[in-house]
Amino acid sequence: MVHELAQVNIARLSAPLESEQLADFVAALDEVNAEAEAAPGFRWRLADDSGNATGIPAFQWDVADSVGVIVNMSTWASVEALRDYMYGGRHVEMLRRRREWFHKVAEATTALWWVPAGHEPTNLESDDPLRYVREHGPTPHAFT
């Protein structure tokens, strides 16, 4: 069976999405998402009717002292394809600025796992790999 890499990444917001503090983040979403979709090895990403996933309720168990949690989930042909996208182009600029928009979290906020090719993971399904990495650390079941 052929597999693809699934990734889930959550972030605790430091301010509401509508706030001035997050204006640059929100303004960049369409461009960053389009860049992902055009990247070699990209397969699928979680999105609602707005074209992004910021309005999709997920991981509410992890809100803690933040105003909310946002989720990013996608599938890729390989670890290398995801890495090349994450650390290149506009996305790496967003990574550099993440402390302006999100709380620093001690626990893992990202999990990777293998899914059958063409499978689109659900929010509920992505909950397990993230909790697993937090409890057990990276293993072949779920890793970072």
Give the residues covered by each predicted segment.
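Short S/T/G/P-rich N-terminal loop/turn motif that feeds into the first structured element of a domain
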Residues: 1-69, 106-144
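An amphipathic, aromatic/His-enriched active-site/gating alpha helix that lines ligand/cofactor pockets
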Residues: 19, 66-68, 79-108
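Short, charged/polar surface micro-motifs in flexible loops or helix N-caps
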Residues: 51-53, 77-82
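Generic transmembrane alpha-helix motif of multi-pass integral membrane proteins
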Residues: 72-75
